[in-house]
Amino acid sequence: MEEMMNEEIVTGVCNLYFDSLNANDLEGVTKALHFPHFRIMASGMVHTWNSAEDLWTWFTNRTSDDGWHHSTFDSIQPKKLTETKFHVNVTFGRYKEDNSLIGKYYSLYVITYDEEKWAMRAASVTG
């Protein structure tokens, strides 16, 4: 039962992150992520952000050229590793305001319980 509750919480973290990005809600992004936050890009480059503001600046600069408006999950698959750590395989699409597809992507989110909350500590991404 506890594992199911934790899976729901972890899925909720993923949804909070996307809902916050889609709503341009920096406070929500702050709640969904641990900082420092780490991102391993498809190229192998590693980004580290010490605040939601830093990540937000990077994200908006990265997505402004392709007309990004919102993202939606195609799948969220959490896998419990320890009592305080999940890996979450996600697939998602990025869309323009007219709902035309920019691209489909796969990511591995590392969600941990730390600092009295469940939040995303890191991600390995394809887009």
PLM region descriptions:
Residues 1-31, 35, 41, 53:
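Short, low-complexity N-terminal intrinsically disordered segments enriched in polar/charged residues
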Residues 33-34, 92-94, 124-125:
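Short beta-strand segments enriched in hydrophobic/aromatic residues
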Residues 70, 82-92:
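A short hydrophobic beta-strand element
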Residues 104-127:
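Short beta-strand edge/turn micro-motifs at domain boundaries
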Residues 57-60, 89-93:
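Short Pro/Gly-enriched beta-strand edge/turn motifs at strand-loop
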Residues 27-76:
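A solvent-exposed, acidic/Ser-Thr-rich amphipathic alpha-helical stretch
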Residues 73-79, 92-94, 106-112:
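Hydrophobic/aromatic beta-strand elements that line small-molecule binding cavities or substrate pockets
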